[in-house]
């Protein structure tokens, strides 16, 4: 099996900002969980309230590892990566520089996913915490975040496609 080499680039500035925002949102989720537990408003949902930030922190850690070691993963274990078809269409030209830039831009989407995971973590923590007092979950807020994330991912992939196919 031939080793695929790409020209390595650092993350885009926007991706770095999205990573910081996502990590801050997860930190806020932890702070909210501790707040709801310290106010002692929740008796039976203590475990669920701590599991939400813990699970989202674990997923964020995995995403950060994939983003950090993206080139190593692609070069040594390409079968582990599920890249969008746009990457392979760009790669038809065999231009390593162009392919490396596109590969790097694809991981901006991973940074965006990290940010939306942080937002969902906050919403779930708020939902569980406020549900103990008012019994009104935030169901519609989940749908809005998921819809915005789907549209955002589509728009970023479209931007990548237009940039490299023109």
Summary of predicted features, one role per range:
Residues 1-9:
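Short, Lys/Arg-rich, polar N-terminal cytosolic tail immediately upstream
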Residues 11-58, 119-150:
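Long, highly hydrophobic alpha-helical transmembrane signal-anchor segments
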Residues 12-18, 92-115:
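Loop-to-transmembrane boundary segments
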Residues 52-75, 150-154:
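Hydrophobic alpha-helical membrane-embedded segments
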Residues 55, 59-60, 104, 112, ...:
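Alpha-helical transmembrane segments, especially those used as permease/efflux helices
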Residues 66-75, 112-124, 163-166:
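Alpha-helical membrane-embedding segments
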Residues 74-96:
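Juxtamembrane inter-helical linkers in multi-pass membrane proteins
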Residues 153-166:
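Cytosolic juxtamembrane helix at the C-terminal end of the final transmembrane segment
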